[in-house]
Amino acid sequence: MPITKIHARSVYDSRGNPTVEVDVVTETGLHRAIVPSGASTGQHEAHELRDGDKTHWGGKGVLKAVENVNKTIAPAVIEENLDVKDQSKVDEFLKKLDGSANKSNLGANAILGVSLAIAKAGAAEKGVPLYAHISDLAGTKKPYVLPVPFQNVLNGGSHAGGRLAFQEFMIVPSAAPSFSEALRQGAEVYQKLKTLAKKKYGQSAGNVGDEGGVAPDIQTAEEALDLITEAIEQAGYTGKMKIAMDVASSEFYKADVKKYDLDFKNPDSDSSKWLTYEQLADLYKTLASKYPIVSIEDPFAEDDWEAWSYFYKTSDFQIVGDDLTVTNPLRIKKAIETKACNALLLKVNQIGTLTESIQAAKDSYADNWGVMVSHRSGETEDVTIADIAVGLRSGQIKTGAPARSERLAKLNQILRIEEELGNNAIYAGEKFRTSVNL
């Protein structure tokens, strides 16, 4: 069934920045995808094309990327008469059309929009939901696995004010019996946390960050973890709710001295207090002994390979690579070879096509890694990643707090999928790291 039209436009993400939306039209109708974007981006990511014209949107316009879809990609794809069900052929064609290693000619944001919209057209042509189409493309077994929602309830780092260095603190309702129960538990803890934050830090502490988490004026990780632990207790889930962190430590790594500055938001930070990677690793272990931490993302800087390997050898929780791996097959291969981490953070816009995202997950599974499908801080109402998490049996999804519609859109989509699948799906629960084998 041929594609009759491909059209891109500039729309807005959840931060009010422009992003690319792509419509693909076939006989089954109109299929639409919107591309997200990140705030703290890894330097090894596929190239997000921005206009750079400071007089419009502060240089963040995407009119070039939109034009690349409408003038270059659309006519070429339509002329090629590609089968929308054959995603790997579609994505291979898009990569060749761009011709660069990191999609910098046409823009990863242009290519991804087309890739995802065509995937939706492929699912429609097969008459199946998107998650089922993705499951076919990835060759995952059944039953479907519904992911544990890692909910980012408290923000620090580059996502917030205050001196708190670590970027995200997440609650992990892995002991819940189902996805819908997990979401309820998460929402209840989140409401308690908001109330507590306002009580302890003043009314403005209830204000939410880019991903829906609260961002009180917190100074240390212990202070943040104590607040979350208290919220879990008040909601009645002590012992049933775990915690995860995204440290995003590349943001406070001092490469010239190979140290980590936990006071990086202070211009007068005392360099004698900066930590070596061994000291930072000890801090993580101390925190994990005091709090129910099951997962740490980006504990070290993206090119501090030695630190990652050291930590991997000496700890037993999930170590997630995001800035380290940037969903890039070469970086994932290196991380596997150097034993740097044991889980991949999968962000489709870091690599730029659905096929490469699926391959990144499969490469990770092959080495017994976990895979966590992730949103970006600049999100939209597009819910594709919910279907990707279910289709890949990843068992874990990170898509913000149970607040702000662009975050809830994904979680609500998984609720619908749970309802639709009924007994044909299982909740990953405590086995989120190995759910692909369930």
From Swiss-Prot:
Active site: E211 (proton donor), K347 (proton acceptor)
Pathway: Carbohydrate degradation; glycolysis; pyruvate from D-glyceraldehyde 3-phosphate: step 4/5
Record keyword Metal-binding present: yes
GO terms for MF: magnesium ion binding; phosphopyruvate hydratase activity
Binding of substrate, residues: H159, E168, E297, D322, S374, H375, R376, S377, K398
Reaction(s) catalysed (UniProt annotation): (2R)-2-phosphoglycerate = phosphoenolpyruvate + H2O
Top-level division of the source organism's lineage: Eukaryota
Location within or outside the cell: Cytoplasm
Pfam families: Enolase_C, Enolase_N
GO CC annotation terms, alphabetical: phosphopyruvate hydratase complex
Co-factor(s): Mg(2+)
Cofactor remark: Mg(2+) is required for catalysis and for stabilizing the dimer.
GO biological process per UniProt: glycolytic process
Main location: cytoplasm
SMART domains: Enolase_C, Enolase_N
Enzyme Commission identifier(s): 4.2.1.11
Top-level EC class: lyase
Keywords assigned: Cytoplasm, Glycolysis, Lyase, Magnesium, Metal-binding
Claim: Flavoprotein is one of the keywords in the record: no
Binding site for Mg(2+): D246, E297, D322
Summary of subunit composition and partner proteins: Homodimer.
Family under the similarity heading: Belongs to the enolase family.
HAMAP family per the UniProt record, alphabetical: Enolase
Protein name as it appears in the record: Enolase
Gene that specifies this protein: enoA
